[in-house]
Structures are given as C-alpha cells and as structure tokens.
From Swiss-Prot:
The lineage of its organism: Eukaryota, Viridiplantae, Streptophyta, Embryophyta, Tracheophyta. GO terms for molecular function: ADP binding; ATP binding. It comes from Arabidopsis thaliana (Mouse-ear cress). Residues 25-62 form a coiled coil. This is Probable disease resistance protein At1g51480. InterPro entries: Apaf_helical, LRR_dom_sf, LRR_R13L4/SHOC2-like, NB-ARC, P-loop_NTPase, Plant_NBS-LRR, WH-like_DNA-bd_sf.
Amino acid sequence: MADWLLLIPWNKIFTAACGCFFSDRNYIHKMEANLDDLHTTMEELKNGRDDLLRRVSIEEDKGLQQLAQVKGWISRVEIVESRFKDLLEDKSTETGRLCLFGFCSENCISSYNYGEKVMKNLEEVKELLSKKHFEVVAHKIPVPKVEEKNIHTTVGLYAMVEMAWKSLMNDEIRTLCLHGMGGVGKTTLLACINNKFVELESEFDVVIWVVVSKDFQLEGIQDQILGRLRLDKEWERETENKKASLINNNLKRKKFVLLLDDLWSEVDLNKIGVPPPTRENGAKIVFTKRSKEVSKYMKADMQIKVSCLSPDEAWELFRITVDDVILSSHEDIPALARIVAAKCHGLPLALIVIGEAMACKETIQEWHHAINVLNSPAGHKFPGMEERILLVLKFSYDSLKNGEIKLCFLYCSLFPEDFEIEKEKLIEYWICEGYINPNRYEDGGTNQGYDIIGLLVRAHLLIECELTTKVKMHYVIREMALWINSDFGKQQETICVKSGAHVRMIPNDINWEIVRQVSLISTQIEKISCSSKCSNLSTLLLPYNKLVNISVGFFLFMPKLVVLDLSTNMSLIELPEEISNLCSLQYLNLSSTGIKSLPGGMKKLRKLIYLNLEFSYKLESLVGISATLPNLQVLKLFYSNVCVDDILMEELQHMDHLKILTVTIDDAMILERIQGIDRLASSIRGLCLTNMSAPRVVLSTTALGGLQQLAILSCNISEIKMDWKSKERREVSPMEIHPSTSTSSPGFKQLSSVNIMKLVGPRDLSWLLFAQNLKSLHVGFSPEIEEIINKEKGSSITKEIAFGKLESLVIYKLPELKEICWNYRTLPNSRYFDVKDCPKLPEDIANFPMHAEE
C-alpha cells in the first residue's frame, strides 16, 4: 500500500492545485478566455500570412526570390496553426472538466497541461503578429553562372565537342560558328559546350543560352537575355533601345559567354546591346546555323562544320535507340537493322526518329516492310518522317531567298540517291527549264547558276563532292525535296522519280496525263514502246540506260516537254521523226549515244536552244545544222565523231545565237582559223584535238579565253606554243613569258580540266602552267614525256607552286617520266591522286602525300 502511494505524482498535484487558486497565469481558470483570445488572434495571424503570401507571389512574378526571414516567419505560422488545430480537437473535453466556476477541474493535471499549451500558443501567436510587418519580402535571385542542359545522347559527338571546345578556349577565337544541315546535331553540340562551362564557373561570370528561331525579332532575343540575367521585370515595358542599354550596362561588366542556337540570318548584336567579344573583356560568342552565309556577316573567327556521323557511329546511335532487346528478338533483325540505319546516311535526327519507330518491331516482316517503305518513292510515309524530320528540314528550304532558287533545289531530287551531279549539267537544266536567267554571257545564266549552287551548298541542302565539279544530295534532304515537290505527298502522281531502280521498261504506274516530271535515270530501260497523251510533261530524264529503240508514237503527245535527256544510251542509234512534235523542247542531250544523224523532223524544233552531241562516237554529219536549228545557243561536240572542217565552220558562223560551243578538231589549220574568228573562238568552252599531226600547235590564251576543257588525243605534235597577245599575234614558247610579272596576266583562266592521251612529240608539258586554275589533269600513254613541268621552263613562267588548285591528278603509262614538277612535293588541294606504270619516276615522288598536312 505504501509503495502505491509513492507512485502518485504529488508534486504535480500540488502545483496544479496551487495553480487553480494562487498562480498568476491561472492556466485552468483562464483556459476558456485564453481559448477565445487564441481563436481571434489566430485568425488575424492567418490573414496576415495570406496577405504576405500574396505580396511574395507578386514579387516572384517579377523574377525576385522570397527572403529567408519571410520564409521562416511563414513556416512558423504553419507550425503554430497546426498546433492550434490540435488544441481545438481537445477543447470540448478539457472545458467539460472544469468545475467551481472554472476555478477547478475534475482532472487538474490534464487541465493544467492543456491550459499551459493554450497560453504558450497564444503568446507565440501574439509574438508572430508583432513581427508580421515586412517592408521587403523578396530580393533579386543570384544569377546561376551556367544553366545545365539536358542532353538525350552524345553518341558520335565526343571528337566534335573536344575540337569545338579547344577552339573556343583559344584566346584568338572570340566568335565561333557551328554550321551544318538540319538534324545533324548542332543544338546537341552547343548544349555539350554549355555544360562544359560548369567546370569553368570560376572563369566566367555568366553563360547565356538564346534560341533565335527562323522568324526572330530583336526584342525576342533581348527578352531572353534579360530574363537570363534576372533583371527586374520592369524591362518588359521598355523600348528596344532601352532594353539594349540595360543589356549593355550589365554585360560590359561581365566576362560572358553568349550561345545563340539556330541563326537563320544576320543578328545585329550591337542593336541587341551585346558588347563585342574582345581579348580585354574575355567574352565568347558561339552560334549555330544551317548555312555558312551568316558566319560571314557575324564575323566568326572560326567555322566548324558539323558533319553526319560515320557508319560506325550511326549504327551505335541507332542500336541504342532501338534497344538490344528488340535487336536480339530474331537472329536476322540485326542485319536488317543495319540496312535501315544506313538509309539515314548518318543524320542523327533521322537515326533517332526512325530508331524510335522501330523500337517496338520484333518481327522480321516488320523490318522488311520498313526497308521497302524507305526505298519507295513514298519514303515520307515512314512513321515520324513527316512531322519529326521533314518538317524540321523544311525550315532550310523555306529560308531560300526566292521561288527560283527553291525550284532549282527541288530539281536536284530528280537524280538517284547518292548520285553525283555535274554542276555544269545541272545549270544547263535550270536554264532551259526557265528557272534562271537564260542569258549565257559571262555575267549571265551560267554564273547565276554557280551562285545558286554555292548558296545551296552553304545552306547544306547540297553536298559538294570530292571533286568540286559535282554535287549530291543527302538521302533525307532528297526525301524532303521529293515530299515538297509532290505538294507534301498530296500529288505524288505529278512527279515520277524511279531513278536507280532496275525497271528495264517504262513503269506502268506512271499517270502520263498528270505527270509533270519523269526521272528514270540509270534504270536499265532497253526500249520504249508506249504512246500516251502527256499533256503536262515538261521534263523527261532517261540517261544512263540501255535504250535501243524508241517507238514512233512515244513523242506524239508531249506539247509541253522542255527538257529531254537521252544521254549515255550507247546503243541508241536513231530517233523517231516524230520528235518534231516536241514544239516546246529547249534542251536535248544526245551525248554518249550511238546516234548517226539527226532526224529531219528536228527542223521543227524552233525553240531548241541546247543540243549536246558530245561523245557521239557514230555521228556522221551535221550538214545543214545552221538552217535546221538556227536558234541554238549551246552546241556541244566535244569528243564527237564529227570534227570541225571548213563546211561546219561556215555553218557555225551563220548561227547568230550561238554562245557556248565545244568542238573536236583534227586539223591544225582549222584550229588556227577558228581561233581567228573571234565570235566562234570566244564561245569555245571545250576543245578536243584528235588524230592531229603537226610540227607545232599554237593556242591563243586571248582568243580561247573561255576555254574550260582541253583534250589532246592520239596526236603527233612536236611543240605546243602559246599566243598570248591577240593584237600582235606573237607566238611564244613558255620560256619567253613570266605571267606573274606580265601586266596582261596571260593564261587560260577558265581552264579547269586537261586530258592528254597518246601524245607523241613533246618531252614536257610546261605550258600547263598557263592554266593557273587547273583542277583535273590526266596524262597517259605518251611515250616521250619526261617531265610534266620542266624546271627551266617552269621557273621562267612562275615562281609559285605549280598546280596549286589541282584536285585530281592521274598519270599512267609514261615510260620516260622522271619528274612531275621540280618545286613541290605536295598538292595542297588534291582529292584524288594516282600514278601507275611510270617506271622511271622516283618512288618518293610517285607516292608523295596528297596534302601538305599529311
């Protein structure tokens, strides 16, 4: 019994009892009054908190950050409010225990403890109320130096990132341009560069990322910069000039990095307010774009081309995207997957989109179907192709300056996949189609064509080939062009492109009444027997086939046909007379065919301005051509079986509209005479000397100023001399002139290709130094040639490195050749080099590197 009494907390009972009657705080007696007071003050506190939260929200909308003391006060209010709710739950129980008019309780200890909590909560609420007045509730957020970007994958980008980063960290590089075709990974590369600045936070004050977009406004760029700098939101209502001033005042005190993603045209950084990057301020600017054009205006210190992935890198990205689980679901799928990946030609965007589409395909039938779709003219129908690839790439097309340039670009899609298109041939097509100026003078259509090709290459819509005389299209860009050309897939029947497919005969699925352009290049077609009404057909491309015969009725109903290309059909020996029905025809290419004569019906082709008969190895005569085709502007007879004689030369003089001419000549006297007829000589672009025997041949650099191609085949010529002063007509050997010091700068400035085969007589070809811009040189089967360039003669002509612009050099079957050129061991621009069967040529010369850096 005594032990039980000892367990009673007599001290608390005593304290509580005293508190009931004698304590100043009267926790029990004042319980109800304190609860009422707590309820009132708590409501006031919550209202104060809500008012403060509204103020904080307004300031945060301005880009400011809540003060820590404000955040702490609000947090304390939340805690007090939670305690208040707990007290309210026990209120009825505790107030129900009160007795003796509230001076005592049925459970004094419980009531005492509860009353104490009420009092302390009330005191804390009153304390918080006394501190609720804040003059300032938020402050400016410290600007993070780098905002890290999320990156999907960096497969194949490591080397490019390292190269770009190394270049950017060079003190001499203040502005860096990353250019490449759409979808190639420029934004990902820029994001990698952005994230690398995390490692250099101490060296730069701020890294700013701006998305420029195609239809950018200066204010839009300014707003992104100001937002990144966390300046007060009052700037939103400011003028463009005021915003520029705010940006300039902020950045001129900082070592900043500006990353501009996706530039489409020149951006005036001065108008935006961005200080120019200098060595003094340490600033850097990097921008990405699809065309090299902008980098010129933005004054980039360095340009880096972002190229497509290598085959191995492309496969790795595709494999990761598809996932190994799918690839291992059937033993044949990996091989099929590699075929699908190869169709993307290393374009990361295509690899990711097509890879994601195939990531759920577990059967070989699905993979075979994917390959069939990608190989078909309806490749744009592949899942995700239109909305995620073609629409992205279309921005590059939309940025082209005008409709004519867009038409020129779309025309390139008529050629087979990976087909290398001759620039000159492409321009001829464009001119005859009417896309560009038909004027063929020095400042006319041809130059305009090269300008357009350059623009398309810089926009990464065309790719310059290894030999710069050719261009080609990336597979996905070609798909985009075909998609646009068919009105975004809505009118596929208006364009028929089956180039590269082995169809052997004209496809039956061509809707001849609707189709506008038909391209059946390299399709192995052997004969054409159909005869359909082709009311809208304007372009018919049939080169690189095996045509033997064209039916009589084929050309009967093609009133709008403008371009007809039958070239490189070696077995085609005649054309039907019904070709006379092609009343709109302007372009006819019969090069590399077995045509023996032109049909009489051609005299009705009054609009024909272009006729190509080059490499026509069976052509017998062109008698009467001036009367038959009086409006010809271009006549090409390079490597033709028809050589210029007095009769043909007379005919050519009567062709008043002739502006471009290529010829084959086998008589030195004819060569001399034609050079004396200024109008004919100045129009010659290609000259083939064949089966010619003469003690010497004189070439006038003035008369033949437009010469671009020269071939010397099976000739016995002891000496080739230059005539470089047209008025004095003085013949000179190479040793008599030094073009680098001559005021008249003699030489064949346009000559880019020379082919010499079976030349007997000369021991050297030093006169080639007069072709300062030579790009391609082929020399073979010439038994007496000992040097390409003789040291004594060459040094008298120029002190510069020979063949500085040469891209292709092929030398073979020259048994006496001992030296190529005395003053070089590199070809700075060489892309193709081959030496064979030249036993006396020193091995170190025969195997010298193509590029100086090698």
